[in-house]
């Protein structure tokens, strides 16, 4: 068959399927899970990603289930405001920034794929075990001896990608950053503006990231995503996304009683907690091998400190679709896609390790020796804070100037 075969029905795979279909390029998606369900917690979609989703006609659908994030706020662990800035359209972007439940995003993409491309073009319970290729196409292999043929294959199967492991068998396990995370969602009254992305504290003693992902219910409560992050030199290899225990981390936030949020009470109100290590992989020298290539987390997994993982997968899909539209030969198309995206994502992977947006918190933590301040201007200038924030936007490709170029 002449189809592009997409391995993985997550955010990257579904967005790619919609993008290829819009360009008239036939595709099929093969997903390991028996059913694609609305699972997970919250993520952020920055304006460079929402711009691409708007091109696919999805902005209205996303607006109905997401929060249009209006501002970012940075606090120390004493609840003192360090810096705040507008986000999305409030910052003059042409497109919004969305804070959204990962499951809601997944369902918007899945519903759009089924209605536009066809429910018969996505195959669940199809765990790809490997890929072979020849001059005419590729063969995906599944358990029990099943297989399927296509023109080319794109692996969108995440950080534990089977196809990535096939091409890089000696790479080893994902690289642990030294930070452990506990994540949850809590129904709570609106915090700050009710559309704020809030970061507080620092990793050495405990850091929180907090943002709403659904509008308030009739009782006035929003669904609010939170992430607790603490430097933990070692972690025991356990199930990814395992159930977490409050006792393992809540002590770091026991005295976080601020006038804008009682953090311990907020954490304890979560229905459940997930625990997993903050990991990435070292950037690869190449993604493409003939008629097979990698996309999203399969290509460039990054630590989640820049609200950028899903967004970079979405940007990959645009580059991939453009390359396949311009090149009838998938080998040439994949080479063009890799040339467009590999260096850019490598910079982001490395920047997320050392100077992500929360570097603002690190800078103040170090300059104050983790003590309260009388005035933030005595610690760091406003211009320095703006420069730290703008630097990441430039590297990650979502400055206003870059998006209007």
Task: Please provide the spans of the model-predicted regions.
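Acidic/histidine metal-binding catalytic segments
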Residues: 64-65, 121, 255-271, 330-335, ...
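Active-site substrate-recognition segment that forms the wall
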Residues: 75, 196-235, 253-255, 278
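C-terminal helical "tail/cap" subdomain of flavin- and related membrane-associated enzymes
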Residues: 1-2, 79, 285, 306-307, ...
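Conserved N-terminal helical subregion
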Residues: 2-4, 21, 46-168, 172-185, ...
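Short glycine/proline- and charge-enriched loop/turn segments
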Residues: 31-34, 87-93, 231-235, 317, ...
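A short coil-to-beta-strand element that immediately follows conserved catalytic motifs
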Residues: 178, 193-197, 223, 258-276
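Short helix-loop capping/hinge motifs at secondary-structure junctions, enriched
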Residues: 188-194, 216-218, 235, 259, ...
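Conserved mid-domain beta->alpha element of the FAD-binding
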Residues: 5-24, 28-34, 154-155, 182, ...
């Amino acid at each position: 068959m002449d189809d592009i075969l997409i391995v993985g029905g997550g955010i990257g795979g579904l967005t790619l399927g919609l993008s290829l279909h819009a360009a008239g390029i036939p595709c099929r998606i093969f997903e390991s899970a028996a059913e694609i369900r609305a699972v997970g917690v919250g993520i952020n979609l920055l304006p460079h990603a929402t711009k691409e989703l708007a091109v696919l006609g999805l902005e209205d659908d996303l607006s109905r289930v997401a929060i249009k994030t209006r501002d970012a706020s940075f606090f120390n662990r004493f609840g003192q405001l360090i810096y705040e800035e507008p986000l999305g359209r409030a910052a003059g972007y042409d497109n919004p920034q969305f804070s959204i439940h990962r499951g809601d995003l997944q369902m918007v993409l899945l519903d759009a794929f089924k209605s536009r491309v066809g429910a018969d073009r996505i195959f669940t319970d199809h765990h790809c075990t490997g890929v072979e290729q020849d001059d005419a196409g590729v063969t995906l292999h599944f358990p029990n001896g099943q297989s399927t043929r296509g023109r080319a294959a794109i692996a969108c199967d995440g950080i534990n990608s089977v196809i990535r492991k096939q091409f890089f068998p000696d790479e080893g396990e994902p690289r642990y950053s030294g930070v452990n995370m506990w994540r949850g969602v809590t129904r709570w009254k609106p915090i700050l503006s009710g559309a704020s992305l809030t970061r507080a504290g620092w990793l050495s003693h405990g850091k929180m990231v907090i943002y709403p992902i659904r509008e308030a219910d009739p009782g006035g409560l929003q669904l609010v995503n939170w992430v607790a992050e603490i430097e933990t030199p070692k972690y025991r290899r356990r199930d990814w996304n395992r159930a977490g225990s409050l006792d393992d981390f809540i002590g770091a936030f026991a005295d976080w009683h601020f006038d804008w949020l009682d953090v311990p009470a907020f954490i304890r109100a979560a229905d459940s907690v997930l625990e997993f290590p903050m990991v990435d992989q070292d950037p690869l020298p190449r993604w493409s091998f003939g008629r097979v290539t990698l996309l999203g987390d399969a290509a460039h997994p990054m630590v989640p400190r820049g609200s950028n993982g899903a967004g970079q997968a979405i940007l990959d899909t645009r580059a991939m679709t453009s390359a396949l539209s311009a090149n009838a030969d998938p080998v040439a198309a994949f080479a063009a896609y890799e040339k467009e995206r590999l260096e850019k994502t490598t910079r982001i992977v490395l920047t997320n390790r050392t100077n992500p947006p929360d570097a603002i918190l690190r800078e103040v933590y170090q300059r104050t020796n983790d003590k309260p301040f009388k005035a933030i201007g005595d610690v760091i200038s406003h211009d320095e804070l703006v420069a730290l924030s703008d630097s990441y936007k430039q590297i990650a490709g979502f400055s206003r100037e870059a998006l209007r170029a």
